[in-house]
Amino acid sequence: MNDKIKENLLDQSCAPTDNLQSNWDRIDWTKAEQAVKKLQARIVKAQKEGRHNKVKALQWTLTHSFYAKALAVKRVTSNGGGCTPGVDKEIWDTPKAKMQAITQLKRRGYQPMPLRRVHIKKSNGKLRPLGIPTMKDRAMQALYLMALEPVSETTADTRSYGFRKERCCMDAIQQCHNILRKGYSPEWILEGDIKGCFDHISHEWLLANIPMDKAILRKWLKCGYVFNKQMFPTEEGTPQGGIISPTLANMTLDGLQKALADRYKRHHVNGKLYSPMVNLVRYADDFIITCENKETLENEIKPLVAEFMSERGLTLSEEKTVITNVHDGFDFLGFNIRKYGKDILTKPTKKSEKRFMENIRKVIKENKGCRQESLIRMLNSKIRGWGGYYQHGATRDSFHRIDHQIFLSLWQWAKRRHSKKGKRWIKDRYWHDIRGNKWTFASKFKKPNGKEDQLTLLSLTS
């Protein structure tokens, strides 16, 4: 065995199970996280130094580490999908089952089971397929993701913001502001749309370019799925629903920023430094590209992007990939971004407003007979989430409009409940004067300690 690999196998973070407490509840999670982070830091260092054999050795060490396996099991049993079984209908819901699961996470003899195919409704009413792995396969993906993520984060495009630690949608929107707010900023935007990105990524490209255990990756890609008790093969794509899938998709699209930068470098024209102002901002498979003129976007950049995608088995949607002027505005990540003079204003898209109100009306309609307190709690959860996402935009008009539509929907809800009562009675029954607002939708309720309190509907504008 290679001496370097022997050295890695002696790493303290690869402690054997018989040296640790066999009780799940007594695992030292702080120590486990420190050990894994130490190995991940070494992977990052080796990747930056171009020592690819060292990277592989460290990845092997990490994926065979007890602590990493324990953290993988903890992740898949602690998140929201921890009670969602795969085709084997197995869940790990006891400390004993979780401890036994750690011992099952072995490379030798590993064969993933087919995914359980389900469909969820998208905002446009269409169905999105999800592939749900078994608990064991999820844990194996979480384990190998710990070894892959240090590499993916080191090599990622700097302006990629989706499915990455300590990055979010707001970072991508802020980057759009940074690019477009200056007086000499680019004025033309290519709004990119990839046809079924997750569903069509080339398996051959992934196997040739993703720096992880190829045998394990091939098994995941080719495991197939079960739908309506029938088995189907998977010949392309990385299924939405797998823990490692977002990282694989990100790594597939990484490199586009460099391809654009290499093609459109700053250069001198007639003794002056010239920049074509080509910038990329990407969140997962949603991206925009800026440029100083429409022709370059249409005739050069769009074909370049199409070729980049084609190499990876992907295609741009001709209908949805459009070029717009920043003064006319463009939609990105649920925001409409538009330049007014020197100011960049962001607000919720009309599509987002419509979808939100459809959701609100659905909740109200489905709860015609529930108590006011219960309805307020359900609505507040949705209002808080939607309002929180858009709180930093130029949302005053949008929020006023939404508040008014919610009021109208609730007024109809109240009228249906008391069809024989007058408007004044209905108003006094459900709306109250609170902090100077006479039309506050509110309900009194009793706390566990017996004291009375008042629950009010959240307002986006207050």
How should these model regions be labeled?
Residues 1-2, 344, 362-424:
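Right-hand nucleic-acid polymerase module
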Residues 1-30, 34, 269-272, 451-462:
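Intrinsically disordered, low-complexity and often Lys/Arg-enriched segments
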Residues 21-81, 146-162:
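Charged boundary/loop elements
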Residues 55-127:
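Phosphate/adenylate-binding "loop-and-lid" substructures adjacent to NTP/NAD/dNTP-binding pockets
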Residues 104, 108, 155-159, 164, ...:
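Conserved polymerase palm-domain catalytic core
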Residues 312-374, 382-385:
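A conserved non-catalytic segment of reverse transcriptases
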